């Protein structure tokens, strides 16, 4: 876990969103399998040796050092800086972390994620039928934010991790709108 979410589920005043740590590690060749708001998942195979495990630990310690030194994004996460140099120019690691943490707090992301699947999407037709309708041109393109009360012809599949949120033939309603949000 990274700082930001207290043990009782309340939000901390300051935080280090896991997405920043994940991006930092990615720039150093460490693969994070899953990133949540304040958690990271690493998978190790049975044949992993101490060198790889210690490499992960070393890079996590390097992140902590660079965070404490408050490096500029240009130096700490070069790939992120390259995506929008004018935005990240002069920005430092702690500023980025607190900015993202503030957005997570404002939008109550952990609570929203916790409740996202309390009510599952409604199955209106089998996936095969939804696919056939797409093949026959009987579907329309709809922006994702306008998907409520419409039957999906395709999966809504964020990647990573590549797990479908909504399957073809399912419909999101007001009860499960949090899936889209």
Annotate each predicted stretch with a short phrase.
Residues 1-181:
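Non-catalytic terminal extensions of PLP-dependent enzymes
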